[in-house]
């Protein structure tokens, strides 16, 4: 379903962007699919969100005194920012290991799939954050608050 919806969105982007209710409904479906705990689904949806964020940043330019997305686009933008905040993978793993000489060295493990997903989601996040930085700040502060509460409740 995600492959079909994102494929239709990519092939008919101009038509969908002209039909706001249809574009919002399709975007809502992709948002629901992106919440599934499947990494392949997330990759498909991340490409869609990258195109969607580009469309919104062109439609609602902030730097030129334009307005942030309002109404349903604003709600969907907020939900996508929350999803990106929750599901964005770490860029790469860095571990400290002892080599054969007994020295502690830094070892980076490469996850090319994860790096590509991270870059795609990061670009979407940056574009959406530029559109409505107040909502983005509130979402990030809430996520940090949850981490602090979790750390304070976990035993040392």
Regions found by a protein language model. Give the residues of each.
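Non-catalytic protein-protein interaction scaffold segments in large eukaryotic complex-forming proteins
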Residues: 1-32, 121
């Amino acid at each position: 379903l995600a492959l079909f919806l994102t494929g239709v969105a990519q092939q008919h982007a101009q038509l969908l962007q002209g039909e706001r209710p249809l574009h919002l409904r399709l975007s809502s479906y992709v948002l629901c699919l992106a919440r599934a705990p499947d990494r392949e689904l997330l990759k498909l949806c991340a490409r869609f969100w990258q195109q969607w964020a580009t469309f919104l940043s062109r439609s609602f330019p902030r730097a030129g005194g334009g307005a942030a997305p309002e109404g349903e686009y604003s709600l969907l933008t907020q939900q996508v920012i929350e999803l990106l905040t929750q599901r964005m993978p770490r860029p790469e793993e860095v571990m400290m290991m002892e080599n054969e000489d007994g020295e502690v060295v830094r070892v980076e493990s490469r996850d090319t799939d994860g790096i590509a997903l991270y870059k795609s989601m990061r670009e979407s996040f940056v574009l959406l954050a530029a559109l409505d930085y107040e909502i983005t700040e509130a979402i990030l502060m809430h996520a940090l608050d949850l981490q602090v509460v979790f750390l304070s409740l976990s035993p040392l």
